[in-house]
């Protein structure tokens, strides 16, 4: 009787501008991951020209990038991105999120990869 492995969950959270998540390869099976990236920035009350941006790279290739004006002066604002990636049997996957800011300050940068069951 075959046993089914529990779906994998990989996660990293930093309070800095760069987060890296390495998912090791699996020799016996192909896996599909739902990848969520979340950036939260603190927006100063007095800065009307603040902006923040988020770039996602998978295995060194840019998958997505966006820059927006930071709203909610004196509070937090953010950017979120979701994608799905297939990891063939064998190789590992490296996910890198890079935040950029002007006026606002990175509070949290999170990458989460959940294996599809």
Residue ranges and their predicted role:
Residues 40-83:
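Terminal beta-strand-rich extracellular "head" domains
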Residues 12-19, 30, 73-78, 90:
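Solvent-exposed, conformationally flexible loop/turn segments
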Residues 30-37, 84-107:
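Noncatalytic modules at the cell exterior or secretory-pathway interfaces
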């Amino acid at each position: 009787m075959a046993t089914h492995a529990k779906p994998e969950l990989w996660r990293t959270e930093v309070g800095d501008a760069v987060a890296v998540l390495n998912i090791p390869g699996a020799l016996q099976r192909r896996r599909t991951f739902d990848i969520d990236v979340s950036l939260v920035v603190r927006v100063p009350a007095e800065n009307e020209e603040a902006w923040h941006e988020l770039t996602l790279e998978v295995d060194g290739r840019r998958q997505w990038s966006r820059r927006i004006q930071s709203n909610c002066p004196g509070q937090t604002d953010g950017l979120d991105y979701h994608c799905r990636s297939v990891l063939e049997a064998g190789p590992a996957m490296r996910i890198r999120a890079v935040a950029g800011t002007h006026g606002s300050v990175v509070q949290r940068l999170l990458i989460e990869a959940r294996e599809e069951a």
